[in-house]
Amino acid sequence: LDDFPTRKHNRLPGYDYTQPGCYFVTICSKDREHLFGRVVGADVLIGPHVQLSEIGAIVKQTISQIPLVDLSIVMPNHVHILLRLPAAGDGPMETSAPTRSVPWIVRYLKRTVTMACGKTVWQRGYHDHIVRGEADYLRIWNYIDTNPAKWREDRYYTETEG
């Protein structure tokens, strides 16, 4: 039994991910493969940006259908999403509690993209951070907004482009 690796759980134990608030979510591609596109434009006026692949365009389109997203970026091998879950009865999603949770939104995104692509493009699990206050929110917003420009410094960066 000790020969098997222990799986690290990324969720905060005992936390209710249906609670109103903001959440920063990162989902990686399977094996961190560059499936979603590539960063281009370091030498042009508009600056670095992600040139999406066909799969990356599907990911971006699917994210755009989630009304609770404040900001997102599709990078070559991962996606960052800043979510805002409203209090019950508030906001654009007037549905039952399970559909108003971070895990439900991640499952929706992964399932929808997988079905559209006809193959698994995601790693198992995802990373999340519960946003704690306005300063944290603004720091995360800036991180997402400048992610393409800082791609080579990103913890998810790999040399493989394409």
Where are these regions (language model features)?
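Short catalytic/metal-binding and nucleic-acid-binding patches
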Residues: L1-G162
